């Protein structure tokens, strides 16, 4: 056991040789390195697998005998100051290492095929390896200085990966947006680290917590000052984990390749923000105002992320807002003091969301066979539909991930989300009502994505791409604002379906299946397909393994008997655990209470699924569905008012709550206006004074010269 801990310092450095060797190869042997580029995936996966095995061994040691191991080296700068750096291994480090390495391995396997035709293949694997190194270094850091250094490396790698296709203006803007947004909170984090050192004189976690707590209990430091210090430390996690109001970078981060999106949303970037809070929880827990702030930010993010996901057309942006909402659940649990539930949901959500993102990548990959490389089309759910029969394996995997996200038993997210929802009643009834209601919204937007993508007919074959309507009288339009003969425009839920307001829908006959499909050949592809096609095996394999994780990872929190003592693997792994809502950590709630809460949560999720099915199932598959819509449209005289309300909600959701617009007007344009004003003042006033003095001196001198001459 001691051997395992002694060599734990190598964890962050194992993947590091890959980017170094790729860089040296491109510098010294550029042609050979590029020609043999596919060989770099194997060592990348191999080295990360070694770290995974090491992490599993550490976790087994933690289960058998929970302990904290810290080793530091002292670097004495002078007699008054010495800096210590080292590594810190506890249960949080071991479980997060397993999470990051497993998801990272699956993403690397997937990306080998996904990025095989991209000219930036080598750059992709170099960045990914550096990303994993940075995240593993963040986990094993023993003090706040090391945390900050690896924190910045994680931010830098996310900047490089989000802007991977930097020649596209959208990707360049997205990576700049992520960088600037995170710099705001990173500045707050750096201030808080300095303030914490000024108060305690220590950077090491254990010394910092002990001194900080003693100062507060003995009233030796001003309470407002320590509250400000803790707030600045928490601010670092707000942007990194996409919490309100600094969540705006997360949807735009979808401009990067899909494997990058999977890694950022499941195991690295956003997980770093969540990781920081439990790492510093012994410091936050003695300041009730900070815990209340954390829970408040969490519940706002939960609701905002779910509502903004309801109307997104881009499949990856919809999943991005889903991630934002689920991160809000984790932050809510941490603010409530439910340490175990928060980390459990981080684990289950990571595997489920990685599965969904890799599934969306498979969908995009199949759509590109028809529309070519065009993210506006290949990622747009308006052009999808009916993919179930074309990509059946992807459909099954995506359905499993969707059901898990909805909280359907026995899938992974059911166990963790149900625990958070149950604890929320003990903390605040208002927060509980919002959290439970959002669980229904989660099921609704998740199944909306599934239904629009896999059910119905492939809409891509019933439209052309020039923004002009096809000559066929059978064009399928799920979105439309103008009246047609077969659908009552006054149906009160119709505005919710409006996504393309400039095009008229066409009437559908009963012989839709007789329509000739269109082969598209004008998007730069030498070979075109009439139908989307399933991805290659190297892309399907990691998805199927993630399906197994999604099915069975929830079992680590199921309690069982061992010699008359109730315990579960997760509690053993997270010992010592902090839970303010359950002071007796060994007493588990009885099965009756569990079944009651589970039945209620599943009922809410089922209602959300039913709502999505009612609104987004393939309406045009039969005339009965159309008659059903018209029957709904005849209800009551208030339907026009309800239509307006629903349309306003939809418009607000589709436009991201106008938060990005507000930031663009108030901050971006304001700063540019200030810069232009400063430039004008500098050129016209400062330079004008200088030039005016010189010109005046010149003419005065010339005048004196003339008079004197």
UniProtKB/Swiss-Prot annotation:
InterPro entries recorded for this chain?
NADH_UbQ_OxRdtase_chlpt_su5_C (IPR002128), NADHpl_OxRdtase_5_subgr (IPR018393), ND/Mrp_TM (IPR001750), NU5C-like (IPR003945), Proton_antipo_N (IPR001516)
Reactions catalysed according to its record = a plastoquinone + NADH + (n+1) H(+)(in) = a plastoquinol + NAD(+) + n H(+)(out); a plastoquinone + NADPH + (n+1) H(+)(in) = a plastoquinol + NADP(+) + n H(+)(out)
Q: Superkingdom of this entry's organism?
A: Eukaryota
State whether it acts alone or in a complex, and with which partners, per the record. Answer: NDH is composed of at least 16 different subunits, 5 of which are encoded in the nucleus.
Q: Is Membrane there in the keyword field?
A: yes
Q: Which Gene Ontology biological process is one annotated for this entry?
A: ATP synthesis coupled electron transport
For this UniProt record, the keywords arranged alphabetically read as follows: Chloroplast, Membrane, NAD, NADP, Plastid, Plastoquinone, Quinone, Thylakoid, Translocase, Transmembrane, Transmembrane helix, Transport
Topology versus the membrane: Multi-pass membrane protein
Family per similarity comment:
Belongs to the complex I subunit 5 family.
**One CC-aspect GO term:** chloroplast thylakoid membrane
The top EC class is translocase
Name the UniProt record assigns to this protein: NAD(P)H-quinone oxidoreductase subunit 5, chloroplastic
Q: What does this protein do?
A: NDH shuttles electrons from NAD(P)H:plastoquinone, via FMN and iron-sulfur (Fe-S) centers, to quinones in the photosynthetic chain and possibly in a chloroplast respiratory chain. The immediate electron acceptor for the enzyme in this species is believed to be plastoquinone. Couples the redox reaction to proton translocation, and thus conserves the redox energy in a proton gradient.
- Mention any Pfam family matching this sequence: Proton_antipo_C
**Gene Ontology molecular function:** NADH dehydrogenase (ubiquinone) activity; quinone binding
Which spans are transmembrane here?
A: 9-29, 40-60, 89-109, 125-145, 147-167, 219-239, 257-277, 280-300, 327-347, 354-374, 396-416, 425-445, 540-560, 594-614
Principal cellular location given in the protein's record: plastid
**Is Translocase tagged as a keyword?**
yes
Enumerate the PANTHER family for this protein.
NADH-UBIQUINONE OXIDOREDUCTASE CHAIN 5
The record's EC number reads 7.1.1.-
Entry's localization field: Plastid, Chloroplast thylakoid membrane
